[in-house]
Amino acid sequence: MEWNKVIRYLAYTLELLVLFMLQETPGLLPPLFGARPVLLFPAVITIAMFETEIPALAFGVVGGLFCDFGLSGTLGFHALVLGVLCFFISLLVRVYLQSNIATALLTGIVGIGLTVCLQWFFLYFFRYSHPSYAFTHHYLPKYLYTLLFLPLVYFLNRGLSQALRPQEESRL
């Protein structure tokens, strides 16, 4: 295995760990409309844009497990959703799309929206009363607040990917 790839994967892992600690530290990120952002969602989506399918799947599963530990839901739910989502985002970017900020925003809007809607549907809708109130007052603000961090995380991961990729591979 190439050393650049090992260092890049370690950097992504460290990034996920730091973002997990930032999102779980009470009072560090102020809540907006009672919602706190999930920084791992944009991180794994943007990592998937710069990696091939299998590493994207792996980082989606790792980020999802961190979310499962922090968001207190069914263990494995976010790992499954984010793993599959990152696999398909990586495949789409490799085959049909270019990796740029517009694509990152589009995939982030759709991917994070899909993840939040699945989270609401499977973890809230059948278990509690007033699901529409919960969606509009908790899940929708969390979705919008999380989207604010997408450009910052995209440029961080683009810089990591370009700096830690071999020269002949980065020209492709």
Describe the residue ranges of each PLM region.
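Terminal, non-globular segments
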Residues: 1-172
